[in-house]
Design a protein with these regions (language model features):
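Charge-dense polyanion-binding interfaces
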Residues: 86-92, 281-312, 519-557
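Conserved active-site motif detector
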Residues: 436-557
């Protein structure tokens, strides 16, 4: 099934799962659904519970990796996920897996365009082991934006070429107004390799608005930055929404606004600009190298669970131990700005697991990402990279596109994903020519020389800090909390109270800071974003982990 954006893919899939179980006499143990993220697996489980109640608990909805770790008989995490899918496929093909563990009559694959060579090998092995098995693969080749990690929509195409296969296109868009859909169709024609051939059709009678605002790349050899005009757009939208709310007759539910960028750095700079104008905004970004289960708050909670169940032989975590672990963790980390991520994760785990199996908790924690638990519901604005906006929708979308001269299909698909997130209005601020030919859009030219914001924020990731520097300071670091201020000096971060250095930036980050300093910026503040567990991959197995600080550096002109 080639499901276009806004076609109700998730709803259709959930209803199909319910139909298989209730109307088509498929037993729950014969049904397997595979997804590419823990967040997707959780969403399907939640929606299925709303539809069929407790019966949803018995349906196997797994990520490719967790299913394969199950077959290999071990719990894994994202760091160890490397060859696990490939190994599982080989074991199935070699007859090394008990037939009853892989005996399925229906296999459902979500986001099938994201399959890699190993994922497709697993699907092929399951098909070979279950000759009568039905496979329902749903995806959109135009939304394959993970080529960098090996995914390729050609594997979805190969499924369409298998014997007795049927190819269905879901082309009705229930999300976006007409001009937005027409513009997205126009743009998609630039993508060279496509499976879908039928244009998407908007189910709305309203036109909507698409604006392409073109900016010069530079004026008098000085680069033009597009943050300020996006801020001005946001201010206008917020003013417009406020006046609508004041008029009770035309009042709508809170309308959502999102700013989509290509890079994390752009997203963080945009966020800082919004905050400097007292606009509430939340950031959803890719957090390279940061694993949810390595957060200090998560590790402490797991430690309390481990201590509590040591005496019990039950695979299920008793409610009193669960509640005690929560209370102790919430109390210890009450001032931590990272605590909401843990709170939200536990809330979701409680909703989707009737019995709290210890193995399920570990799998849930190991497979989750920090950004899975970012609550964007109470923000005026969501600032996000395009990658992290996939699967979401907003009333208004503003895109910041500094595009390359020769965009690849991968880049074009990324822009297509961003464009199709919006329901009502799309505004693209760009300094290139890629969007010039879009007929359904209003084209504007803004010749103003916008400068960089006076304040920027740099978020340090693992590669931006000297990881070994923090080893001797583990105890001191574990006493700190996310959100606490630090003092920056000579490429080091220290505790304001004692002056003790606890972190140092990497050589690469020193060079980056040097470039900002040459533009007139200097670090004026620093604060802890996350405290995380870390150990070198080359370290001996018995070596203890270090605690490292990932901080935000505020720079001003």
């Amino acid at each position: 099934v080639a499901a276009g954006p806004g076609s109700g893919k998730t709803r259709v899939l959930v209803h199909k799962l319910a139909s298989l179980l209730l109307l088509e006499d498929v037993k729950h143990e014969q049904l397997l659904m595979l997804t590419f993220s823990r967040a997707a697996a959780t969403e399907f489980k939640q929606r299925l519970m709303q539809l069929i109640g407790n019966a949803a608990h018995f349906v196997e909805i797994k990520t490719f990796h967790s299913y394969c770790f199950d077959l290999l008989g071990r719990v894994g995490n994202l760091d160890e996920a490397g060859d696990v899918v490939k190994q599982a496929a080989e074991m199935i093909n070699n007859g090394e897996v008990e037939p009853n563990r892989i005996s399925k009559t229906v296999l459902v694959i979500d986001e099938a365009q994201d399959m890699s060579k190993d994922d497709y090998a697993l699907v092929s092995a399951l098909m070979k082991a279950n000759e009568e098995m039905r496979v329902i693969a749903v995806g959109d080749d135009d939304q394959n934006i993970y080529e960098f990690r090996g995914s390729n929509s050609r594997y979805l195409y190969e499924l369409t070429q298998t014997e007795h296969s049927r190819f269905i296109e879901m082309t009705e868009n229930y999300r976006s107004l007409r001009h937005i859909v027409d513009t997205a169709n126009d743009f998609a024609r630039n993508i060279r390799q496509r499976i879908k051939s039928t244009p998407i059709i908007s189910m709305s009678q309203e036109d909507g608005e698409v604006r392409i605002v073109k900016h010069p790349y530079e004026i008098q050899e000085k680069k033009v930055y597009m943050y300020q005009p996006i801020l001005e757009d946001v201010t206008r939208l917020l003013g417009s929404n406020a006046s609508k709310e004041a008029d009770a007759s035309s009042r709508k539910k809170n309308e959502t606004i999102s700013i989509l960028t290509q890079t994390n750095e752009e997203a963080v700079i945009m966020l800082a600009l919004l905050h400097s104008h007292n606009i509430k905004a939340k950031l959803v970004q890719s957090m390279d190298g940061l694993r949810f289960w390595n957060l200090a708050e998560v590790r402490y909670f797991l430690k309390k669970i481990d201590q509590g169940i040591k005496e019990t032989k039950s695979p299920i975590i008793p409610d009193d131990i669960w509640e005690a672990a929560k209370q102790q963790t919430f109390q210890k980390y009450a001032t931590s700005q990272a605590l909401p991520y843990l709170r939200r994760s536990l809330q979701i785990f409680e909703q989707t697991n009737r019995a709290k199996y210890y193995s399920d908790l570990r799998e849930f924690v190991f497979e989750s990402s920090v950004e899975d638990f970012c609550d964007i519901s109470k923000s005026d604005i969501v600032v996000s990279t395009i990658h992290k906006a996939k699967g979401h929708e907003f009333d208004y979308v503003l895109m910041l596109i500094t595009h390359p001269e020769h965009p690849t299909d991968d880049i074009l698909r990324r822009y297509y994903v961003g464009m199709t997130r919006t329901k009502r209005t799309l505004a693209i601020h760009t300094n290139g020519n890629l969007f010039d030919s879009l007929k359904s859009a209003q084209h504007l030219y803004d010749a103003q020389a916008y400068d960089e914001p006076k304040e920027i924020v740099l978020q340090l990731s693992h590669k931006d800090v000297n990881l070994g520097f923090s080893k001797p300071h583990k105890d001191a670091i574990l006493c700190l909390r996310s959100g606490m201020p630090l003092t920056y000096h000579d490429h080091c971060l220290c505790l304001p109270s004692t002056g003790r250095d606890i972190a140092q930036v990497s050589i690469k980050m020193k060079e980056k800071l040097g470039k900002w300093e040459m533009k007139g910026y200097k670090v004026t503040a620093a604060r802890i974003r996350f405290i995380v567990a870390w150990k070198s991959k080359d370290a001996p197995r018995d070596e203890k982990e270090s605690a490292i600080v990932l901080a935000d550096l505020v720079m001003k002109k």
